[in-house]
Amino acid sequence: EIVRLEKEEIPAILTAAETGDGLGGRQESFHKHTKIRDSAIIALFLGTGIRNSELVGLNTDDVDFSNNSFVVTRKGGNRVILYFNDEVGGFLRDYYEQRLANKAASPDDKALFLSLQNSRITTRAVQNIVKKYSGVAAPLKKITPHKLRSTFGTQLYRNTGDIYVVADVLGHKDVNTTKKHYAAITDDIRRKAAVEISITDSEKNK
């Protein structure tokens, strides 16, 4: 079974990143310095299905707000365009503007996401960010960046019913990998499809 966030937990983890509610001690004191960055990271995972390694590899010039897109380097070195909606774009733009205004960062460092030491953020640091806020939103689940990716994949599959689209967006080379991961949702998709089919004049029956 896929471990993922449920619908009500998705806004909860974003709220935790934005507000810091539920954090304690050092986490709470650092939150004001990291909340814009952390919110953008959580939003990107939930809204695009990006991999942790792809996220930390992003550079400032990989983002194109005019097309709501960014370029990631996939396994094997392939460069692929991913798209985000306006909601995700809002979080990303807020951080992007903060990042460009950061005078402490080296002008030669093109990394999009920076640590508090103003160097490219690490995958371990991103794991800890996700762990921190998911501990508030879903304390009984062990949520990782990959689980947020699974959450996105689940949402996309439920919305499209198209396993091939999900495989393509997630960057799975073999669609059978995707089918295996999301097999449990297939029955729900079929059930929803059956409900959508009308065999009479629905307008007349209203």
Q: What name fits each language-model region?
A:
Residues E1-K206:
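Conserved catalytic core of the tyrosine transesterase superfamily
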